[in-house]
Design a protein with these regions (language model features):
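Nucleotide-sugar donor-binding catalytic core of glycosyltransferases
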Residues: 2-42, 47-50, 55-282, 299-304, ...
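Catalytic binding pocket for nucleotide-activated donors in carbohydrate/polymer assembly enzymes
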Residues: 264-373
Length: 373
């Protein structure tokens, strides 16, 4: 089977890289199974030389205002034998409506268990965690940053959306490097050019699990800025950060921003780490926490359906309320249970490792075959 994946012209996002990474890494395995996979970024007749044409949502994100580009994209998607639209947007709540026109099949990294949410006329925001912040009057609705809901879309279309795989299969190595930006650049370069991870020891994923009793940081509260371009993100993340700050004194809390080497040192010394939502529900922080064997504290993820599903309540992570109001009680409760936190940390790391392609590519390969059956 020949598959062509269409990317945007001269644009590579971190999310796109992490979504495609398992394909790069497993290319030889997939070739042995009869798959020929090509990446292209130009709209020409070569796109028709395949069994399945896959259009990444970043094509619309970066070229959606270009009428000539979009007309050509529609033409090739109609002429192709079969077209998939691969939505790699951050949140389970956001769709590309033109993706329904382009793809005969619409795949998304994650989706809400409650499909009726999408067509509910009372939603203020497609992202469920944004909607929660607005409806509880924590902030006023900011129409500039909030798209319309999807109540005008047929329920049948929503119900037909399928799940591909999420960015947890990307590359989140946490070894020391002069800067995180440079590290990400090296990882992108080696997967783009070499199509496989470098074999040197320093470039391998590390699944450290330092002696838990020796760790001297109780809680790590270091995450991206309270993005002022989004009031819901700003409120949500600040609520978690403020609760963590209020615990300083009773517990040793590391919060704020650190040079990359210092941050990675803290990852090896921490027992627990907070990872609130951002534009999407899953964040890179989750995966850094899992890799380093830290107990993940995260807003409740039970509303989300995804693959792989790393989030098993009170087994691989510890959920807290979306307004962060119960963080203090949660921490007080779990630290009093002998060995409980360490077990959560080990479970989270082992589950993440079981899906990670550096450890075992077979789960992804099976998923890939399901998606492209």
């Amino acid at each position: 089977m020949k598959i062509i994946i269409l990317r945007p012209i001269k644009v590579t996002s971190k999310v796109e890289h992490d979504f495609l990474f398992p394909i790069f890494r497993c290319k030889n395995y997939l070739t042995d199974l009869g798959y020929t996979i090509k990446l292209k970024n130009k709209l020409d007749n070569s796109l028709l030389n395949c069994d399945i044409l896959c259009v990444l949502s970043t094509c619309i994100r970066h070229h959606g205002k270009d009428k000539v580009y979009m007309d050509e994209l529609r033409k090739f998607s109609e002429l192709a034998k079969l077209t998939y639209f691969l939505d790699i947007s951050d949140s389970g709540g956001v769709f590309y409506e033109r993706g329904f026109e382009i793809g005969a099949v619409y795949y998304k990294k994650q989706i809400y268990h409650d499909r009726s949410y999408y067509t509910n006329t009372n939603t203020c925001e497609p992202r469920m965690h944004f909607d929660y912040v607005i409806k509880n009057n924590f902030i006023k609705k900011d129409s500039h940053n909030i798209p319309d809901n999807y109540s005008h879309i047929s329920k049948n279309i929503i119900d037909d959306i399928r799940i591909s795989w999420n960015v947890g299969l990307g590359d989140y190595r946490t070894f020391s490097f002069p800067s995180k930006t440079l590290l990400r650049g090296v990882i992108r370069m080696q997967t783009k050019i070499c199509r496989k991870p470098m074999i040197f020891p320093m470039f391998q994923n590390r699944y450290d699990f330092n002696e838990y009793s020796d760790r001297n940081v109780d809680l790590l509260s270091c995450f991206g800025s309270y993005d002022l371009t989004s009031k819901p993100i700003s409120f949500h993340r600040k609520a978690s950060a403020d609760m963590a700050a209020s615990l300083n004194g009773d517990y040793k809390v590391a919060s704020g921003f650190f040079p990359v080497d210092e941050y990675y040192t803290l990852l090896r010394k921490a027992k627990m780490a907070l990872s609130p939502f951002g534009w999407g529900e899953m964040t890179w922080k989750d995966f850094e926490v899992f890799i380093n064997g830290i107990a993940l504290l995260k807003p409740n993820m039970s509303h989300l359906e995804t693959w792989p599903d790393y989030y098993i309540e009170n087994e691989t992570y510890l959920p807290y309320e979306w307004d962060a109001s119960d963080i203090s009680d949660l921490i007080e409760r779990v630290v009093s249970k002998d060995g409980f936190l360490e077990q959560i940390a080990r479970n989270g790391q082992e589950r993440f490792k079981s899906f990670n392609i550096h450890n075992d590519p077979s789960p992804f390969i099976q998923r890939f075959e399901t998606v492209f059956a």
